[in-house]
Amino acid sequence: MLAQRIINGENISKEEALSLFVDNNIDTYDLLHEAYQVRKYYYGRKVKLNMILNAKSGICPEDCGYCGQSKLMKNKDKYLLVDSEQIKSGADFCATHDIGTYCIVMSGRGPSDKEVEHIADTVEAIKHEHPQLKICACLGLTNDEQAKKLKLAGVDRYNHNINTSENYHDEVVTTHTYQDRVDTIEIMKANNISPCSGVICGMGETDEDIIDMALALRAIDADSIPVNFLHPVKGTKFGNEDNLTPERCLRILSMFRLINPSKEIRIAGGREVNLRTLQPLAMQAANSIFVGDYLITDGQPNELDYKMLEDLGFEIDINESEINKAALKI
């Protein structure tokens, strides 16, 4: 049994993973069942909730082909870094709605030192009011000194997605390298900030690219892996892409779980438009979701997510230490 091999500690190879992913003779729901056995072993029926705040929007020199905030987009919502009270208001909402992780996101290549100070001061205030709330910062490319300030302020996690495979990266963006992204993740790890890194599927990548992404994140050892499904933005390079089906999304999530068995696999942007009515099934592979809106696209109403989890018989987990430690042999 595939799931039992993985639970026993075996890392599946690229060759086997790719074969599982592309073989039409392997039923999607059989593959999803294997993923669920692994998910259940590490997380039971628990689900982590995350919420995003778009704290700075549309001001960016990068040319990412999926992004409505890139330098190539003319009609976009632009604003500078919001004040502390607005950021803290989002934290208050999280604390009263069983949302365990609050993600503060900024557009741009990377933050200025002044912006890092602003975020750090605000995070300190949030931690004073809500010490159990996990704070994830997503500010772009950073340096070691900035990472130290964020750690000291109480930032628990830092998100910087690899977005795609190293082989496909230059088709997605040309203003920074794949290694730039990996370097930022490594800086955070060196400063004992939990690394969060994920992908965007549906940008024209190959099946092999999908598997390469999951394997790269295994090598990076990201604690949290958001899996985004492209929600095409009109006017972007990938604005006309339409190659995802709900079933393909389920296969992708299954492979990310099987390749990264103990990690937090989060269904992120684009789940509503790509998974559609199969969103509940996706929770058999994933153990985490974003609630509320995304950066520039709308999510579904919160009450639908809470109701979905209730109907599934899943339990909201706001304590990130609740992973099955026996399973991890800690």
UniProtKB/Swiss-Prot annotation:
It catalyses: (4R,5S)-dethiobiotin + (sulfur carrier)-SH + 2 reduced [2Fe-2S]-[ferredoxin] + 2 S-adenosyl-L-methionine = (sulfur carrier)-H + biotin + 2 5'-deoxyadenosine + 2 L-methionine + 2 oxidized [2Fe-2S]-[ferredoxin]. Binds 1 [4Fe-4S] cluster. The cluster is coordinated with 3 cysteines and an exchangeable S-adenosyl-L-methionine. Binds 1 [2Fe-2S] cluster. The cluster is coordinated with 3 cysteines and 1 arginine. CDD domains: Radical_SAM (cd01335). Disulfide bonds: none annotated. Belongs to the radical SAM superfamily. Biotin synthase family. Homodimer. This is Biotin synthase.
